[in-house]
Amino acid sequence: MIRRLNNLKNMKKTYLLLLFVVLFLKGFSQEQDMTLSLDQFLEIVKLNHPTIKQALNDVEMSEVKIIGARSGFEPSINGSYSEKVFGEEQYYQSFNPEVRIPTWFGIEAYGGINNLEGNKYSQSSTFGESSYVGVSIPLLKNLLMDSRRATLKQSKLFLQMSNFERDVVVNDLLMSAIESYWEYVNSYELMSVINENLANSQKRLDFIRKSYFNGEKAEIDTIEASNQYQMFSYKRNDAEIRFMKSRLNLSTFLWKNDNVPYELPQEVSPNQNWKGDLKNEKVEFILNKLLEASQVHPIVKTYELKREVLDIEKQLKFQSLLPKLDLYYNHLGKGYDVGNTLNNHRYFDDNFQTGVKFELPILLMKGRSDYKIANLKLINNDLDLIQKQNQINLKVKSYYNEYEILKRQLDLQYVIYDNYNKLVKAEEQKLMNGESSLFIVNSRQMKALDALEKLINIQAKYFKTIYAIQWSVGSLK
């Protein structure tokens, strides 16, 4: 319930954003330049995605289960009525209501009244109206741990585990969404570059054709210009298909708040603020700090809490190896007012009933089996934790090394692309001076385009890796 209230607050904070997206879907503001930033995209994902809602529901279920676990300590009212008549003779008629109050330390307090009438009844029973209060105390088995305490302790740990499991779900979902977003950005940038080159090649083809008809260019130049235009047209088709697929893939993460999926409109494009971030900011990571952060990864915390759960189970199973030795004491009173005899403080002189119950399986086969299994579960969980921690550390190191390499590649590719651009401009100048050919200019341009495409791909990988590092330490929330 608390988390749903928080969700309502989040809905207020992102109201304008959702309205913005809904307007997309309804076709409003089509004349406006509509863009979607990564932050806007992730806000929608976090607010409306069914997977996150399911994770929140799992947390709420864990909260409710604690209430169920507390029922083991809930006071109860019990009652019994019995009567026997045989051969037109009433043997007995008994009525016995009772209140029982379990306590945290295994001690159970109780009190009740009894009304026994008839002609034939057990000599150990008290005839007429009587009352009693008493306690039952475990002296060995169930003294330090019992199923009620174990269930409640474990349910509280399960709640903490469900919170960390929710963080794991959110961490994984956001990483998948981020990867899809940067693929969307990447395909859009490549399509934009190719469209720009296609438009330029169209202008060049028109210019060459006019020059050919004016006798200024050879026919071979028109063929060269036409081939380049056709090649860019082909690349544009490929780029549009890739962008369409990336847009549809991005749409799989987008949902309305009424659990209805929606598709990102074609008119929407990625926000260009990331280019400023790339130019002005350099993210720095310190490997040792990342490895320290990985120690509190939600997956690691889940296994640590699971160990506590299994340790409680082991404590409970150990109780099966102990003999059951329970002491009980009832203070009795005539009539329904047992309080009068309690005030006399003569608890073991008069008006009392006491006893001891003892039970012990001779071979303890079930107890030994259950305890051994509980211990093996703990060992397996510790082994799983070691493996998971190692896997997380290796992922952190892998993404960190990839990030460091991509930083260098990015700087190098900027230089390569800039150099190719200079070669294109120089070749175009030589063409204007009659010292080069259109074929060479086109060749230079293709190499410059290849360098730019590679630069765009590296930029997308660079941003993906930044978020992958955060994902590897479990910090995407």
Regions found by a protein language model. Give the residues of each.
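Bacterial Sec-dependent N-terminal signal peptides
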Residues: 1-33
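Periplasmic alpha-helical coiled-coil/stalk elements that build and connect Gram-negative outer-membrane
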Residues: 7-10, 157, 164-289, 402, ...
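Bacterial Sec-pathway N-terminal export signals of envelope proteins
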Residues: 28-90, 140, 144-148, 154-156, ...
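Small/polar, glycine/serine/threonine/aspartate-rich low-complexity segments that form flexible
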Residues: 31-33, 80-137, 268-282, 315, ...
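Amphipathic alpha-helical coiled-coil segments
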Residues: 42, 54-69, 169, 173-194, ...
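Sec/SRP-type N-terminal targeting helices
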Residues: 53-57, 70, 104-128, 139-170, ...
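Membrane-embedded alpha-helical bundles of multi-pass transporters/translocases
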Residues: 62, 73, 100-103, 111-112, ...
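Metallo-beta-lactamase
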Residues: 239, 298, 381, 458
